[in-house]
Amino acid sequence: MEITKEIFSLIAAVMLLLGSFIALISAIGIVKFQDVFLRSHAATKSSTLSVLLTLIGVLIYFIVNTGFFSVRLLLSLVFINLTSPVGMHLVARAAYRNGAYMYRKNDAHTHASILLSSNEQNSTEALQLRAKKREEHRKKWYQND
């Protein structure tokens, strides 16, 4: 029985470490990516997985070591995994409708710094021209709204 407890504790610890590592990858993606759409992808996909792994690890730890099953942890798992992607989808949709900067591969420098802002990679005229094109596209498609 003691060996089983140790194995489950090890599984819980590995899940916590994996969740922390994936959260670190998510943070790097948020800093590295150039526009709101890529950043929202990094924030949603990997942080949802990191929270999932972390909470499952905590749930296993509590069940094995204290014999306590937390319904709150289970509800947190369900709530976060349902609301995080939906919330980020709404943020990305609002950004798209408001004409947010959209990264294009040809605009970026090949060896840009990790902290280089997306606006520093493009000229003001190019950004204004793209914003004007997006506005014309929006007027064409959403004139009934």
Curated annotation (Swiss-Prot):
GO terms for MF: sodium:proton antiporter activity
Q: Which GO terms describe its cellular component?
A: plasma membrane
Q: What membrane topology is annotated for this entry?
A: Multi-pass membrane protein
NCBIfam families reported in the protein's UniProt record: CPA3_mnhG_phaG, PRK12586.1, PRK12674.1-2
Family of the protein in this entry:
Belongs to the CPA3 antiporters (TC 2.A.63) subunit G family.
Q: How does it assemble?
A: May form a heterooligomeric complex that consists of seven subunits: mnhA2, mnhB2, mnhC2, mnhD2, mnhE2, mnhF2 and mnhG2.
The protein in question is named Putative antiporter subunit mnhG2
